[in-house]
Amino acid sequence: MTPTVHTWPILETARTQVLEQGIGLTEDQLVEVLQLPDEALPQALELAHQVRLRHCGEDVEVEGIVSIKTGGCPEDCHFCSQSGLFDSPVRGVWLDIPELVKAAKETAATGATEFCIVAAVRGPDIKLMNQVKFAIGRINEEVDINIACSLGMLTQQQVDQLAGWGVHRYNHNLETARSFFPQVVTTHTYEERLETCAMVKAAGMELCCGALLGMGESLHQRAELAAQLAALEPHEVPLNFLNPRPGTPLENQGLMDGKDALRAIAAFRLAMPRTVLRYAGGRELTLGDLGTREGLLGGINAVIVGNYLTTLGRPATADLSLLVDLNMPIRELQKTL
């Protein structure tokens, strides 16, 4: 006799609404996904994977990141060791242009199609903008790779300059839900982040706007964030999981439960069926090797390879080998601008 397979109403709803119709789940529906019991998790991940394949295709986008300016940031993001306001071990360092070009070449050699230049600042000054301009020019001369930037909050003039220099994608994370944001950042507002995101989209650059989960937010606030990101319609959403850093206000927060992280991956995919959903920081500790594999079979379709800004990632070879094992092709480089 064949055993009965239990089904959950929210997953049946998602199968019709998201998989078949391509309509993301609402905030209330996402809460139901995040509250699913552990025994429902394999079905949720399988459905999220089917959604990814149908609405995004089978390719996986690989990206490398490097910091042009590390540490000394004047903002007080409670999770970040690059803040100059906390007693953390990260100190201010600038990276010169030859080092950036070298990093871009190494990134391209892994098969990555995107290289992101990051700076720990509230927003770029003239010195930083000039350095970014020269770096973009040199990288384009020597490396065939899309260039992205993450330089904090921008003015309209800076947005126009970056677009004019050929920046393919701009990263500016919401990080957490509007209702939780004041508990993790007080030196700028949620609305200021949204303003930069809106200008980036209006200028024709792709918007990369991500989340950092595990900072003490509730399940309802995770659903709120997923819905707010879906409303923003970014091209890409990096999913980060808190890696508590010494000297920051969240150093004792602890790691997010791995199954909760997988539930969140499925929920974010069901909220945004057509968005690039990228593995980013903290997954090594939160999910480990097995969880990383499960996430790639549960809605993820992009990865950052190598190290992050202030923490170590998985070796690029480990991620690339895993993609080969899962028969997931790496997206070929396409210049879109």
Swiss-Prot record:
Record carries keyword Transmembrane helix: no
CDD domains the record matches: Radical_SAM
Gene Ontology molecular function: 2 iron, 2 sulfur cluster binding; 4 iron, 4 sulfur cluster binding; biotin synthase activity; iron ion binding
GO biological process: biotin biosynthetic process
Enzyme Commission number, as recorded: 2.8.1.6
Reaction catalysed by this enzyme: (4R,5S)-dethiobiotin + (sulfur carrier)-SH + 2 reduced [2Fe-2S]-[ferredoxin] + 2 S-adenosyl-L-methionine = (sulfur carrier)-H + biotin + 2 5'-deoxyadenosine + 2 L-methionine + 2 oxidized [2Fe-2S]-[ferredoxin]
InterPro entries per the UniProt record, alphabetical: Aldolase_TIM (IPR013785), BATS_dom (IPR010722), Biotin_synth/BioAB (IPR002684), Biotin_synthase (IPR024177), Elp3/MiaA/NifB-like_rSAM (IPR006638), rSAM (IPR007197)
Binding site for [4Fe-4S] cluster: C73, C77, C80
Necessary cofactors: [4Fe-4S] cluster; [2Fe-2S] cluster
Binding site for [2Fe-2S] cluster: C116, C149, C208, R278
Keyword Cytoplasm part of the UniProt annotation: no
UniProt keyword list: 2Fe-2S, 4Fe-4S, Biotin biosynthesis, Iron, Iron-sulfur, Metal-binding, S-adenosyl-L-methionine, Transferase
PROSITE patterns in UniProt: RADICAL_SAM
UniProt xrefs under Gene3D superfamilies: Aldolase class I (3.20.20.70)
Source superkingdom: Bacteria
UniProt domain Radical SAM core: residue ranges: 58-283
Disulfide bond annotation, renumbered to this chain: none
Cofactor note: Binds 1 [4Fe-4S] cluster. The cluster is coordinated with 3 cysteines and an exchangeable S-adenosyl-L-methionine.
Subunit: Homodimer.
Function: Catalyzes the conversion of dethiobiotin (DTB) to biotin by the insertion of a sulfur atom into dethiobiotin via a radical-based mechanism.
Family note: Belongs to the radical SAM superfamily. Biotin synthase family.
Protein name per its UniProtKB record: Biotin synthase
Originating organism: Pseudarthrobacter chlorophenolicus (strain ATCC 700700 / DSM 12829 / CIP 107037 / JCM 12360 / KCTC 9906 / NCIMB 13794 / A6) (Arthrobacter chlorophenolicus)
